[in-house]
């Protein structure tokens, strides 16, 4: 055969280069179009991890990993992460399941174990590194976040079986124990066997009985912090016992941010049951002070120069000074006090749609960090991005 019919070396190299470029282009395209979508569960736990005070959060994620033909197509994930409360840094982040449900949360932490409920069931992790001790309780237990809860009377997680029986997992153990019948009966009408998008853990004040909604934020000394309605005052301002404390210029429809406490029907008082429980998750909601014990309050509103967004401002209740301004968010699903004072806010960044993937830690001196959870790098590896505000 003549050499003229043989492919030249440069032709072979050119063909290979084109193939590599095509495959590389496909890979880059899959990474560019695979931004992870993340939903953090608002039910969180607290633990000491590597000598850090930390918050444990459970979240669902879709996308962000390397899909076929280059990867495992591990698109849907339930994950749990530990975040340091002092600086917002990620301490660990592990995959719990390879499917994503509607709801998830860290129910309790005890004796180095974290109890995490998802729509796959109940799992138990080691808090120091996130290693999985128990993946799930077994096939006989419901696959529903709302099929699990904590009963402090018996110091245990209560778990609903497919047959309607209520079992207990004593905190600090992975054992299965019996539940006294009177306690089990109350939980049978509280726990929910089926997962549902309507069964979310809603920490909004819209779940609070309007008649029981506080008129202001009570301080330990008895004074009351309020934000007057527009029809009560033409000026946007923060009041302390009716006297101006701070102006709220540039903030539309400002409101105080309360700690919303959810009580499952099985543990609710007669008065709480009379106020009512949510139809889809069987919890009573009440609003109480947030930050006031440590001399601060949060105010939420819409910045006048950024319509449609939300902004949080932290105020000193003694001086009226603005200690922190948290902007660029599209709302928050929960604001809650951590055990030692800082306020934890789970929020969505502006323009991210339904993603609740920001863990904001607001310290009482105003120092604030925002941790972007569930993000992935170019190679699909999980990472967290921390911003100091």
Summary of predicted features, one role per range:
Residues 2-389:
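Secretory-pathway ectodomains
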């Amino acid at each position: 055969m003549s050499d003229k019919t043989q492919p030249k070396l440069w032709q072979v190299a050119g063909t290979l280069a084109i193939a590599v470029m095509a495959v590389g282009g496909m890979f880059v395209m899959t990474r560019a179009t695979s931004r992870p979508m993340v939903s953090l569960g608002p039910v969180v736990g607290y633990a000491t991890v590597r000598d850090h005070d930390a918050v444990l959060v459970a979240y669902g994620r879709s996308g962000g990993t390397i899909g076929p033909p280059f990867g495992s197509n591990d698109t849907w994930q339930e994950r749990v992460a530990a975040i340091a409360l002092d600086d917002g840094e990620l301490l660990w982040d592990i995959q719990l399941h390879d499917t994503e449900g509607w709801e998830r949360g860290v129910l309790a932490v005890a004796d180095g174990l974290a109890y995490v409920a998802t729509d796959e069931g109940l799992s138990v992790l080691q808090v120091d590194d996130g290693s999985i001790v128990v993946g799930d309780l077994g096939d006989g237990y419901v696959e529903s976040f709302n099929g699990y809860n904590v009963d402090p009377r018996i110091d245990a997680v209560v778990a609903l079986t497919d047959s309607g029986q209520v079992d207990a997992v004593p905190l600090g153990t992975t054992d299965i124990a019996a539940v006294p019948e009177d306690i089990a009966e109350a939980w049978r009408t509280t726990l929910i066997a089926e997962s549902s998008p309507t069964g979310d853990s809603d920490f909004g004040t819209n779940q609070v009985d309007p008649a029981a909604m506080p008129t202001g934020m009570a301080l330990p000394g008895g004074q009351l912090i309020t934000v007057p309605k527009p029809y009560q005052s033409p000026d946007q301002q923060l009041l302390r016992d009716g006297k101006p404390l701070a102006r709220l210029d540039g903030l539309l429809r400002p409101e105080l941010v309360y700690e919303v406490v959810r009580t499952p029907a099985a543990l609710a008082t007669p008065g709480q049951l009379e106020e009512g429980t949510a139809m889809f998750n069987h919890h009573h909601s009440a609003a109480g002070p947030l930050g006031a014990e440590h001399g601060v309050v949060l105010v939420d509103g819409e910045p006048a120069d950024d319509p449609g967004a939300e902004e949080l401002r932290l105020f000193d209740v003694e001086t009226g000074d603005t200690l922190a301004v948290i902007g660029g968010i599209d709302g928050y699903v929960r604001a809650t006090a951590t055990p030692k004072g800082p306020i934890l806010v789970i929020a969505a960044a502006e323009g991210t749609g339904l993603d609740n993937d920001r863990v904001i830690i607001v310290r009482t001196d105003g120092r604030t960090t925002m941790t972007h959870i569930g993000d992935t790098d170019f190679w699909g590896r999980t990472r967290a991005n921390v911003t100091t505000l």
